[in-house]
Amino acid sequence: MSSAQRVVITPGEPAGSGPDLVVQLAQRAWPIELVVCADGALLTERAAMLGLPLSLLPYSPDVPAAPQPAGTLTLLPVSLRAPAISGQLTVENGPYVVETLARACDGCLNGEFAALITGPVHKGVINDAGISFTGHTEFFEERSQAKKVVMMLATEELRVALATTHLPLRAIADAITPALLHEVIAILHHDLRTKFGIAEPRILVCGLNPHAGEGGHMGTEEIDTIIPVLDELRAQGMKLNGPLPADTLFQPKYLDNADAVLAMYHDQGLPVLKYQGFGRGVNITLGLPFIRTSVDHGTALELAGRGKADVGSFITALNLAIKMIVNTQ
């Protein structure tokens, strides 16, 4: 990188393993500045519980970004609303979690930070606090006023984007419209080019129904919706292969000639990716006006404060964000 950049990290649920993982991230030097939006006392306490060194440096947006020395983090303080006890959810801290996300998002929007890396949150406790919260993806979409965002998970070997995200199965067929597919594929194609540096992205597209509809005998969404959209976009120069049956698409015959897979719904594409690379995956939100990556796992409340949480996915998410920053320069 030509000069140091500054990224912002949110540890997520304070009672979970997120704060532990952030402390573990700090045990190595980084070529960028790591600004953590969190309660400083919480991070200091977790470092002590893990027996790891940690010095918190004050965040100053007026000071040029510098590489992060090992054993340190730059702190952008947000105060807990109640004490955080490892492994025990506290509804009073639901607003704290949302406040960290809002401050980090706003910092990306105003140019303070080059990317945002998020730790795992507990959706239930946030909603129990009276805050409507579906997930990070939807939260950042609304706060950034993005027209549309796309959820994509990635490992070193595989990228899977979703046409729909957190919808019940009975609602998915109605949600797969020509307008939706045009938007999702356009965003996926654009961000693969601009954020991943792929000049001509090759995208595999899953069918919605078993056997991709079997010529209309197992559903007509492929014939009525998916195929016409793909034909239109191919005519514009996009390299799209599909719709293909999801039960046979995930094999080298297809994947060796593709840069990403577009699945029609959450549990069509993600089980394969998580089986192939759980703990090494990264969640990326495409379509935002900034770079956002995240771990691919949950809060792991039972591991909080015990030093047993695996930092691998967080390291991968941070490294991918750094690569994406380079690609967009």
UniProtKB/Swiss-Prot annotation:
Binding, substrate: 136-137, 274, 283, 292
Residues where a divalent metal cation binds: 166, 211, 266
BP GO terms, sorted: pyridoxal phosphate biosynthetic process; pyridoxine biosynthetic process
Main function: Catalyzes the NAD(P)-dependent oxidation of 4-(phosphooxy)-L-threonine (HTP) into 2-amino-3-oxo-4-(phosphooxy)butyric acid which spontaneously decarboxylates to form 3-amino-2-oxopropyl phosphate (AHAP).
Subcellular location: Cytoplasm
The protein's Enzyme Commission number: 1.1.1.262
Gene Ontology MF, one: NAD binding
Note: The active site is located at the dimer interface.
Gene this protein is translated from: pdxA
Species of provenance: Salmonella typhimurium (strain LT2 / SGSC1412 / ATCC 700720)
Designated name of the protein: 4-hydroxythreonine-4-phosphate dehydrogenase
